[in-house]
UniProtKB/Swiss-Prot annotation:
GO terms, biological process: pyridoxine biosynthetic process
Sites where the protein binds substrate: K55, Y112, R116, S120, R180, L181, H182
Superkingdom of the organism of origin: Bacteria
Gene name in the database record: pdxH
The keyword Disulfide bond is annotated on this UniProt entry: no
Catalysed reactions, semicolon-separated: pyridoxamine 5'-phosphate + O2 + H2O = pyridoxal 5'-phosphate + H2O2 + NH4(+); pyridoxine 5'-phosphate + O2 = pyridoxal 5'-phosphate + H2O2
Name this protein carries in UniProt: Pyridoxine/pyridoxamine 5'-phosphate oxidase
PANTHER family associated with the record: PYRIDOXINE-5'-PHOSPHATE OXIDASE, PYRIDOXINE-5-PHOSPHATE OXIDASE
Cross-referenced InterPro entries: Pyridox_Oxase, Pyridox_Oxase_CS, Pyridox_Oxase_N, Pyridoxamine_oxidase_dimer_C, Split_barrel_FMN-bd
Amino acid sequence: MTNASDDFTESSQPFKLFADWLTDAKASEPNDPNAVALATVDPDGLPNVRMVLLKDFDEQGFVFYTNYESTKGKEILSAEKAAMCFHWKTLRRQVRVRGAVEKVSDAEADAYYASRPRGSRIGAWASKQSRPLESRFALEKAVAEYTAKYAIGDIPRPSYWSGFRIRPVSIEFWHDRAFRLHDRVLFTRPAPEGDWNKERLYP
C-alpha cells in the first residue's frame, strides 16, 4: 500500500494517481472499494445522489452501468453531466470527479453484461428500476417469469440497460491531515480532450 506520507501532490497524472489510490483501497477497504457516490440533477436543478459501483476507468473516463429508464439514467440523459465522489475511510482519502457524460458502446455494454452473474442478468429484465412497486411478491413473480423465459441459452442485454462514461473536466484528490490542514490537489481541463492543469487548494 502507498505510504500515507507519500507526497501525492507531486503527481502530474491524475488517472495514474487514481489507479494507485484505488489499488490501495482494494487492499484496505472491507467492502466495495469501487463504490462511489454519483450526483445528478433533475430538470428543475434539484440534486440527486446515490451509490453506484465503478466498473472500469481509463484515460477516457469513469464507467458505471445502470438502467437508462431509471431516475439516474433519465437525469443523465437529460443533463449530460454528472459528478462522482469516492471516499475511502480506512485510507482517509477522497477523490471528486466532475464532467460530461456519454453512453458506452454497445460492444462495451454487451461484454460487461455477459460477465455478470445469471441472476443479475435476470434482474435487469425483471426490475422496472425507480418505478413504483406494489409488493415484494410482484418483483419475485417477475424474476420467476424471466427465469422461465430464459431458462435455456443466453440472456440478452435489455436495450435500456447499458453504461455511462463520465469524461472528467476536473478531478480533485484529498488526503486527511491533522488539525484539518488537509492536502488537496485539483486537476482541471477545459474539455474532456484537453490537457490537464494542476493546482493545490487550501483545505
